[in-house]
Every structure is written in C-alpha cells, then in structure tokens.
C-alpha cells in the first residue's frame, strides 16, 4: 500500500484477532486446533500463535465481540488436515467445492468464531 506521500507501508506482521468470552477455555480449543501451545501470552487475556512467518492468530478476551470473527487458513492438503482435526476431537464440517478447484471446510470455536480451512487456494486464479 502506498501512503499519502507515495511511499510503501512497511508491514512486518499481520495479526488476526479472535475475540472470545473465556481465554483459558479458548486456549485449550486453539491448542487442539494448532496441535501445540501458544507461542506467546503477552497479557492475561491474550494468547497468540504464529501460524506462518509474520502471520499471527491472537485469541483475546472480549465479551462484547466474541463469536463475530472469521479466520481463513489456506492449507496444502485439506483432507489430511481435516483427518488430523477429527483425530484430535474437533468436528470440521463437510467439504464444499467452491470455484476453480477450491474446497472449503469450516468449524467453530467455543464462542462461534468461524475457522475456514481452504484447500486449492492460489494467489492468482
């Protein structure tokens, strides 16, 4: 993105914030989703996972906005990821064929925030 002066913004990290009602309950759920403990716990009501270099998911206690978020994760092998999630006790939804070879599945955290797994994602279609 260019600033008003025409210079590029220097973005180093992108953080997806997921508001929840109970950070400890959600921590356990996201630990199951990611298969590991959080990378950081910078404050009592926030835990975060680095999911790709420069890309973070922050789970933040915010009763007013809990359940209002959608986070999309593009994965290489959708079926393998879904099998792993089922093995860990999560319940992803049915796979839906989208467009141009893209396939989708969704699941919800304890507050109803939607997590979409996307197979067949490409930068250019």
Q: Which residue stretches match the model-derived regions?
A:
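Short secondary-structure junctions
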Residues: 34-41, 91-95
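Conserved active-site alpha-helix within GNAT-family acetyltransferase domains
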Residues: 24-33, 114
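Short hydrophobic/aromatic beta-strand element in the GNAT-like acyltransferase core
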Residues: 46-48, 56, 72, 92, ...
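Vicinal oxygen chelate
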Residues: 2-8, 13-21, 63-125
């Amino acid at each position: 993105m260019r600033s008003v002066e025409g210079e590029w913004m220097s973005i180093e990290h992108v953080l997806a914030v997921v508001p929840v009602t109970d950070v400890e309950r959600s921590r356990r759920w996201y630990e199951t989703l990611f298969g590991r403990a959080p990378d950081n716990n910078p404050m009592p009501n926030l835990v975060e996972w680095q999911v790709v270099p420069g890309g973070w998911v922050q789970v933040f206690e915010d009763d007013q906005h809990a359940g209002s978020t959608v986070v999309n994760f593009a994965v290489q092998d959708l079926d393998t990821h879904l099998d792993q999630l089922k093995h860990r006790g999560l319940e992803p939804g049915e796979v839906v064929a989208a467009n141009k070879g893209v396939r989708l599945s969704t699941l919800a955290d304890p507050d109803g925030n939607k997590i979409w797994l996307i197979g067949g994602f490409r930068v250019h279609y």
